């Protein structure tokens, strides 16, 4: 058990909530930042966690408000920076996504640079910052931590979320090099599994959409990973002294057709979409290396279990009923 003090930013989020849960379980004192500590949908599920009464402190902080993380990170040994904007339909990508992602990350790291107690920062990045380098991705291609997304590829294809994660991670590495901060990044793909927070998150919404009467399924192949593995990887990346650099987290890459097949086997009575959203050839799958992630002790919960946990969780929260 640990009696260390750590900070989790964006603590009400999907990954962060699980991270707070694991940290409290392990005996940490957690300073958790949220944008609005007075909003019960953002804090109630955190305050209900085991150990929260004794060891969870909430702080108000905003990604774009300079210095607003100073008090949250002060006196901490570790900082887990998970807060980041995520929208699909953006009208003004620069204002809505790019600036907040980069400025927010640098704002948190700047607060960290003022606190001498901090031993390591663990940054929640994304496979988005890894895999889009213009190289074709096919079933025999293995994406690993040496890949870096090319911002020009993102701009050409208008992949604004991908660009935001890429620029934020890149800015973070430059900043920590300059300031001598020890940082590790976790780069998960589509994160699914049980929800602790009461509101729907983006990746669970993708599953909800296909089980709740969507006419078509997307022509897309994604890497999939369980939220519990992602939260655990963050903890291990902080606790294991030799952890360094980036860690891709993907249990497997699957096209939506495979995802639907698994859901059909789990829930044979569910009406699922049978038609693809376009007539193009299916986007091929690819591989993502697990070597580094395994060095953190991650054993990878299989996709079928992750899908079942996601759907059972959506039912439990009455977000879907069947």
UniProtKB/Swiss-Prot annotation:
GO terms for molecular function: oxidoreductase activity, acting on the CH-OH group of donors, NAD or NADP as acceptor. It catalyses: 2-phenylacetaldehyde + NADPH + H(+) = 2-phenylethanol + NADP(+); 2-phenylacetaldehyde + NADH + H(+) = 2-phenylethanol + NAD(+). Highly expressed in petals. Expressed in calyxes and leaves. It comes from the Eukaryota. SUPFAM superfamilies: NAD(P)-binding Rossmann-fold domains. Keywords: NADP, Oxidoreductase. Its EC number is 1.1.1.-. CDD domains: FR_SDR_e. NADP(+) binds at residues 42, 161. The keyword Nucleus does not apply. It holds the Pfam family Epimerase. InterPro entries: Epimerase_deHydtase (IPR001509), NAD(P)-bd_dom_sf (IPR036291), NAD(P)_dehydrat-like (IPR050425). Belongs to the NAD(P)-dependent epimerase/dehydratase family. Dihydroflavonol-4-reductase subfamily. Catalyzes the reduction of 2-phenylethylamine to produce 2-phenylethanol, a constituent of floral scent in petals. PANTHER family: CINNAMOYL-COA REDUCTASE CAD2 (PTHR10366:SF852), NAD DEPENDENT EPIMERASE/DEHYDRATASE (PTHR10366). This is Phenylacetaldehyde reductase.
């Amino acid at each position: 058990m640990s009696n260390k003090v750590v900070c989790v930013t964006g603590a009400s989020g999907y990954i962060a909530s699980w991270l707070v849960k694991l940290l409290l379980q392990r005996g940490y004192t957690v300073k958790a930042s949220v944008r609005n500590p007075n909003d019960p949908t953002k804090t109630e599920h955190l305050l209900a966690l085991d150990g929260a009464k004794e060891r969870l402190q909430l702080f108000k902080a905003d990604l774009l408000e300079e210095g607003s993380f100073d008090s949250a990170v002060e006196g901490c040994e570790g900082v887990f920076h998970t807060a980041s904007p995520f929208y699909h339909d953006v009208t003004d990508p620069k204002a809505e996504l790019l600036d907040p992602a980069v400025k927010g990350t640098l704002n948190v790291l700047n607060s960290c640079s003022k606190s001498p107690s901090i031993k390591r920062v663990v940054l929640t990045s994304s496979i988005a910052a890894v895999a889009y380098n213009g190289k074709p991705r096919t079933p025999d291609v293995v994406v690993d931590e040496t890949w870096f997304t090319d911002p020009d590829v993102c701009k050409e294809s208008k992949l604004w979320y991908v660009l935001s994660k890429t620029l934020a991670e890149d800015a973070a590495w430059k900043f920590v090099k300059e300031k001598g901060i020890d940082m590790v990044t976790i780069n998960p793909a589509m994160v699914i599994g049980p929800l602790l927070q009461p509101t729907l998150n983006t990746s669970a919404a993708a599953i909800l959409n296909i089980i709740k009467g969507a006419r078509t399924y997307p022509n897309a192949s994604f890497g999939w990973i369980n939220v519990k593995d992602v939260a655990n990887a963050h903890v291990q990346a902080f606790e294991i002294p030799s952890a360094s650099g980036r860690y891709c987290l993907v249990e497997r890459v699957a096209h939506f057709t495979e995802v639907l097949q698994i859901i059909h086997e789990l829930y044979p009575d569910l009406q699922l979409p049978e038609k693809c959203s376009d007539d193009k050839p299916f986007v091929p799958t690819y591989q993502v290396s697990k070597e580094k992630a395994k060095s953190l002790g991650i054993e990878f919960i299989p996709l079928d279990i992750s899908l079942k946990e996601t759907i059972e969780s959506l039912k439990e929260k009455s977000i879907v009923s069947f």
